[in-house]
Amino acid sequence: FGSLLGICLMTQIITGLLMAMHYTADTTLAFTSVAHTCRNVQFGWLIRNLHANGASMFFICIYLHIGRGFYYGSYLFKETWNTGVILLLTLMATAFVGYVLPWGQMSFWGATVITNLFSAIPYIGQTLVEWAWGGFSVDNPMLTRFFALHFLLPFMIAGLTFIHLTFLHETGSNNPLGISSNCDKIPFHPYFSTKDILGFLAMLVPLTALAMFSPNLLGDPENFTPANPLVTPPHIKPEWYFLFAYAILRSIPNKLGGVLALAASVLILFLIPFLHKSKQRTMTFRPLSQLLFWILVTNLLILTWVGS
């Protein structure tokens, strides 16, 4: 899935650059500029749909990639694993700030709710929120800085990807048995290159199908309404890939407790290398660990379903 994530990143950067050329980071113009891109720019609709649904593909791939690393004990490459977790956090930040840019109803209220979470931090919380907003409400200053961040972060992700790969090349990659694969090494081309191209097709075909046939399947219909600070949507919820964390946040009645649980749900990944106590690296021959692993997966799926 690593190669797929690389392709995702490249696709997102290319489609994103093409859209940034037609986007205006201003509260009065953002929504109309996106509509203009879809209506009047050559293939603008396709570029936008690929970009929006490409994010979903990105998260599908990264969750599968993390799950596989978890199953096969790849977290024992500590540096690779930790840079990977940092990559995940950066990706989540990028997706969040990007979601705000079209300035639809859910963009606006999602931004309001999530930035407000910072106010749960004792002492500095309120100051932090006003600093993030650039004022006393979600308005133009925040939109412009979110656009700047959304432009910047993908390049940071690209840089971190190289660090991630450099650490991986120090050790070589893992395999399902968790043993040294030096005796099984084969040329990258044509073997791995063919395997990767198959993966690219398996991802890009559903992505183009989604972008062409039902581009709004995963989106929120509220975002067809321009942002209105005076009308709260009936259900404020993020895109599907954040629902598990959002469900955790919402399930805790205390604000600070919810924020901590939300953060912990992702940051727990940093602890995994220290929790490995088995003599075997992978879960291939560990039925009990497998059971716990699949319970975790089911939990995440249930949280995602409950969150919506």
From Swiss-Prot:
Keywords, comma-separated and alphabetical: Electron transport, Heme, Iron, Membrane, Metal-binding, Mitochondrion, Mitochondrion inner membrane, Respiratory chain, Transmembrane, Transmembrane helix, Transport, Ubiquinone
Residues noted as binding a ubiquinone in the record, renumbered to the chain: H169
Location in or out of the cell: Mitochondrion inner membrane
Subunit composition and interactions: The cytochrome bc1 complex contains 11 subunits: 3 respiratory subunits (MT-CYB, CYC1 and UQCRFS1), 2 core proteins (UQCRC1 and UQCRC2) and 6 low-molecular weight proteins (UQCRH/QCR6, UQCRB/QCR7, UQCRQ/QCR8, UQCR10/QCR9, UQCR11/QCR10 and a cleavage product of UQCRFS1). This cytochrome bc1 complex then forms a dimer.
Name of the gene: MT-CYB
SUPFAM superfamilies: a domain/subunit of cytochrome bc1 complex (Ubiquinol-cytochrome c reductase), Transmembrane di-heme cytochromes
Organism: Asthenes dorbignyi (Creamy-breasted canastero)
Main location: mitochondrion
Example GO BP: mitochondrial electron transport, ubiquinol to cytochrome c
Protein name as annotated: Cytochrome b
Function in brief: Component of the ubiquinol-cytochrome c reductase complex (complex III or cytochrome b-c1 complex) that is part of the mitochondrial respiratory chain. The b-c1 complex mediates electron transfer from ubiquinol to cytochrome c. Contributes to the generation of a proton gradient across the mitochondrial membrane that is then used for ATP synthesis.
Cofactor(s) for this UniProt protein: heme b
Residues that hold heme b b566 according to the record: H65, H164
